[in-house]
Amino acid sequence: MSLQISILTPEKPFWNGQAEEIILPTETGEMGVLKNHAPIITGLDVGAMLVRTKEEWNSYALMGGFAVVKKNKVTILANEAESAETIDAEEAKNAFEIAKGNLEKAEGVKQKVEANFAYKRAKARFQVVKVVNKYS
């Protein structure tokens, strides 16, 4: 038996399916989940999530949230989620470069916090595109 994965966003159920493995961007680093994983609830950071089905790896950009792992079911409650296939590679690369520059130029606490969030978001989108498209 494999893992049953459900990814939910405020707008709609984003993805449901079976997977052999999932790698989550938690607030303390990446966390891999295989079948028979110990039960856990964890916060998700903005970052790339990888899902391995029997056929392939799929990548998604998550914009924070929570994950619940219990009895071979993984439920992800994400603020936002995007599939790599729906992200334009050039736009993601340009947005990443702009966000990186804005973070380096940010002054003051508010501007640094906003620039850091924009950077993490752009980095997540660019990372998932690179995984799928081998873009660099």
From Swiss-Prot:
Keywords, in A-Z order: ATP synthesis, CF(1), Chloroplast, Hydrogen ion transport, Ion transport, Membrane, Plastid, Thylakoid, Transport
The entry's localization annotation reads: Plastid, Chloroplast thylakoid membrane
Q: Which Gene3D superfamilies match?
A: 6.10.140.480, F0F1 ATP synthase delta/epsilon subunit, N-terminal
**Record-level GO cellular component terms:** chloroplast thylakoid membrane; proton-transporting ATP synthase complex
Pfam families in the record, alphabetically?
Answer: ATP-synt_DE, ATP-synt_DE_N
Q: Which GO terms describe its molecular function?
A: ATP binding; proton-transporting ATP synthase activity, rotational mechanism
Q: Which family does it belong to?
A: Belongs to the ATPase epsilon chain family.
What HAMAP family does the record point to?
A: ATP_synth_epsil_bac
List the protein's name.
ATP synthase epsilon chain, chloroplastic
Q: Which organism is it from?
A: Tetradesmus obliquus (Green alga)
Q: What is the lineage of its organism?
A: Eukaryota, Viridiplantae, Chlorophyta, core chlorophytes, Chlorophyceae
